[in-house]
Amino acid sequence: MSGAAHADRRDSTVGLDADVLAAGAVLWRHGTQSPELALVHRPRYDDWSFPKGKVDPGETMPFTAVREVAEETGQAARLGPVLDDVRYTVPEGRKLVRYWAAEALGGEFVPGDETDELRWVDPAHAAEMLSYRHDVDVLERFTALGPPASMVLLVRHAKAGSRHQWDGHDMLRPLSETGREQARQLARLLALFGPDRIASASPVRCRQTVAPLAEKLGLPVLDEPLLGETEFAQDPEAGLARFRELAAEPGVSVLCSQGGVIPHIVGALATAAGLPGVDPDDVPSRKGSTWALAFGEDTTLRAADYYPRPTG
């Protein structure tokens, strides 16, 4: 991963100043010398663009991006970093399209009414083929970042039962009913990133938060005791070093931790990388929220996207 790093908190459709919301992706796969990107031809407009489409009622924008990629290219995909928001005017009013980088996982293109041709091209050819300047801008953002070498989805546990009403050891305090529903919603969001492994700090509420995802994907939940609040407070450097080891694992890792850990890790990584957009003294970390952290080959943080806890 090379080029300019970035941080992004544009994670929710709430409050977006647009009449039409859409989502799409720069879909990439490994090529011989550079990534190959998927461009689709739309016969209705006779143009070449990245796969994208409108957000359906009840959908989240990340889900829309993955669904539209599948519908327009036939490819399964896993999301990477957010690239950009594109705004322009259509007959229905102001339109906003949010783009992710997304890795192609395989599939077969079938021509249809919406897209009748799919081409895999290198970034230079993509810049020549794209019909719209705003798509070229998105391409330039992707080229600047490059495909991530690895990602960590750093999740704060969902809402737990009241500490004051719990008689047992705090490590054993479980999720509340609200927290269990948040965990189920998180499973739907996190699955869009195609996790390869799932890990958790030791508290029961952390493990319960990622349990629905583990069940959905058929993966075990690995224990990461150094990344719980108590252990991290005793030796932050050891905890941060362990997190860097996890970030060096290829593919996508999920780690569920706590509010006393996540801001420290994100702030330290962003400061070390000189990442704009993250204030190390004000790192959000609400219960049920996720930081999607993308890393380069040297495990330097390259992009950071904050997703508040899902609401549906």
Residue ranges of predicted features:
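N-terminal strand-loop-strand
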Residues: 2-50, 152-157
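Short beta-strand micro-motifs in enzyme catalytic cores
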Residues: 21, 94-100, 151, 289-291
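Short, well-ordered beta-strand micro-motif
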Residues: 27, 41, 99-103, 120, ...
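Conserved Nudix-box catalytic region and its N-terminal flanking loop in Nudix hydrolases
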Residues: 33-76, 166-173, 178
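Short, solvent-exposed aromatic-acidic interface loops
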Residues: 43-45, 304-312
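Active-site-proximal alpha-helix that buttresses catalytic centers in soluble enzyme cores
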Residues: 53, 58, 64, 148-235, ...
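Unchanged
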Residues: 55-79, 86-138, 143
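Active-site-adjacent alpha-helix immediately C-terminal to a catalytic or transition-state-stabilizing loop
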Residues: 240-300
